A protein has these predicted regions:
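Hydrophobic, small-residue-rich transmembrane alpha-helices and their short perimembrane loops
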Residues: 1-160
């Protein structure tokens, strides 16, 4: 097996571990007073409702395109597409959960501890989404390439 196929999933796992580390550091930050927590809970509820509705709409598109790929190309590319869509949804979910937590903590840090602390929390929140996308992307492409060692098949992952 090629060295890159061994190292790449490890790098993906490290990216996800970094994302989880950053997410846990955001969780530890002070979310502020009761009113701030209440507003943050409304924002989180709205964000999760949005994602749920968006994912329901995307599910129909993913299902149709999955069938089209099976018929038009091959089942391996269709599976790659499905894995890509799933990993994309996971990254979006992680990103949204952390972003809603980071927002209130950033606002509170700006009020109580200053701009440097607030920017640190805000950038940490953004890095969770970025590292989730990178980690899941590298892991997904690596595993699919190990299973289907044809770059044309793995391109379905990117479509997802």
């Amino acid at each position: 097996m090629d060295f890159a196929l061994i190292v790449a999933p490890i790098v993906g796992i490290l990216a996800l571990l970094f994302a989880f580390y950053k997410a846990s550091s955001i969780d530890k930050a002070n979310p502020g007073n009761d009113r701030m927590k209440e507003i943050a809970s409304f924002i989180e509820e709205g964000a999760m409702a949005f994602l749920q509705r968006e994912y329901k709409a995307l599910l129909m598109f993913v299902a149709i395109l999955f069938v089209v790929l099976i018929i038009g190309i091959n089942w391996q590319t269709a599976i790659s597409f499905l894995v890509g869509a799933l990993f994309s949804a996971l990254a979006g979910y992680f990103g949204m959960k952390v972003a809603t937590k980071a927002n209130v903590r950033t606002a509170n840090a700006a009020m109580e501890e200053g701009m440097n602390k607030a920017l640190n929390i805000a950038f940490s929140g953004g890095s969770v989404m970025g590292m989730s996308v990178v980690g899941l992307g590298i892991i997904g492409v690596s595993i699919l390439y190990i299973l289907f060692p044809d770059p044309a098949i793995v391109t379905g992952f990117g479509l997802g």
